[in-house]
Amino acid sequence: MTNISISEEIATACPDLHVLALSCDVCNSEPDERLWQEIADEEKAVRETVKLEQINKWLPIQATRQAYKRLGKDPNRYRPSSEALRRRILRELPLYKVDTLVDLINLVSIRSGYSIGGFDADKISGGSLVLGVDRKSVV
């Protein structure tokens, strides 16, 4: 089992942060049409119930944006993934088809409003993962 921890910077800036970690064995595949039908249904529901100017007012997204600000990140430049996905939907831009696991994580993110990370435990070196803030400048 991988040991997951939160950096001191995040723990200090976001004392109410809750993290859920699930571990499971899965078999990934190319994009699945049944899953993409479910994603299409969710896209339709988002278009029917959400306005572009309301996205960042939704509590899960609003909380993530506040956390970004506390950590020195501009949430208008570095949008939470759940917000970015909903914005793509409302702009009628297609969502990227990556693979079944990534597409499923994106669907859960769209529905829940929470940004979700998926990691391959076999690729985590040293058996531990620290959730932190990237301080590298992006060009």
Model-assigned labels for residue ranges:
Residues E8-E42:
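Gly/serine-rich nucleotide phosphate-binding loop at the start of the catalytic core
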Residues S23-V26, N106, S112, V133-R135:
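Short, structured patches in soluble enzyme cores that scaffold and shape functional sites
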Residues D32-A84, L90:
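Glycine/proline-rich, flexible active-site/cofactor-binding loop segments
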Residues S81-R86, S125-L129:
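Short, conserved phosphate-binding/catalytic loop or strand-edge motifs used
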Residues P94-F119:
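Conserved phosphate/anionic-ligand binding catalytic regions in large, soluble enzymes, centered on
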Residues I116-D134:
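Regulatory modules associated with amino-acid/nitrogen control
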Residues V138:
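Conserved small/polar residues in nucleotide/adenosyl-binding loops
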